[in-house]
Amino acid sequence: MRELFCARAIRAGYRGHEVVHGVSFSLAEGELCALLGANGCGKTTLLRAVCGLTRGEGDCLLEGESLWRMSERERARRIGYLAQRSRELPRLSAMEVVMMGFYPALSPLQRPSAAQRLDAQETLAQLGAEHLAGGDFSKLSEGQRQLVLLARALVRRPRLIVLDEPDSALDFPSRRRALRLLRETAQANGACVLLCTHDANFALRYADRLLMMEAGNLTGDFALDSAQREPLRCALTRLCGPVELAVQGGRYAVLEGDGP
């Protein structure tokens, strides 16, 4: 698969405190990569740096172009981003929030087209959330908001999709639909997905690749279709505590131990 995204020696933090220490990795077209780590290890800071929301040293390249040198508007056209926590968007319907995903591609006086509205409706439907379209976004549950914001991140079919704990508030059926759509979007459009999670089984079940992060450094990188059991188990044990791995449906699964 062709390399689509490359992070080069990223150092980033906040208020003068470095949190991410020279992290490098690349993502290929169609790849869904999970970033696994404990609270406070730097996952969110790394994802924000990838999106140009937190600046530091190094660089992030998408299709050979520096994301950090692009305008904010151009980055927003290339990246679909879902933050860890939703913010209040008063007096907007769920459909209006999803339609905001088109704004970076429109001129200041343009409005989304009828075709784009249909795309927004279809994306909500693919997430099982079409019934939320007319609802007041501010009155939705956290899980419902997460689905709407995920639809906003995906509706424009961006080349790079960055998701901070997209599974944290979703029930199991919603989680399955969301991951199915992410995989279909990545493969159909040649995009790549980088998502962070605390749930080792979630990562093992759905990702093509697993990155592990500890104290601001990447400490593991496994292609899950070819990873050997014992090195993967040892890496997960170091990160999560004692675990055993089984193969279920052709994929690894954690049998024991708590997630980070």
Task: Write out the residue ranges for each language-model feature.
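The feature captures the beta-strand-to-loop junction immediately N-terminal to the Walker
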Residues: 36-38
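Helix-to-loop junction immediately C-terminal to a conserved catalytic motif
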Residues: 51
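Conserved ABC transporter NBD signature motif
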Residues: 58-66
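Catalytic Walker B motif of ABC-type/P-loop ATPase nucleotide-binding domains
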Residues: 161-165
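H-loop/switch region of ABC-family ATPase nucleotide-binding domains
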Residues: 197-198
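ABC ATPase nucleotide-binding domains
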Residues: 230-260
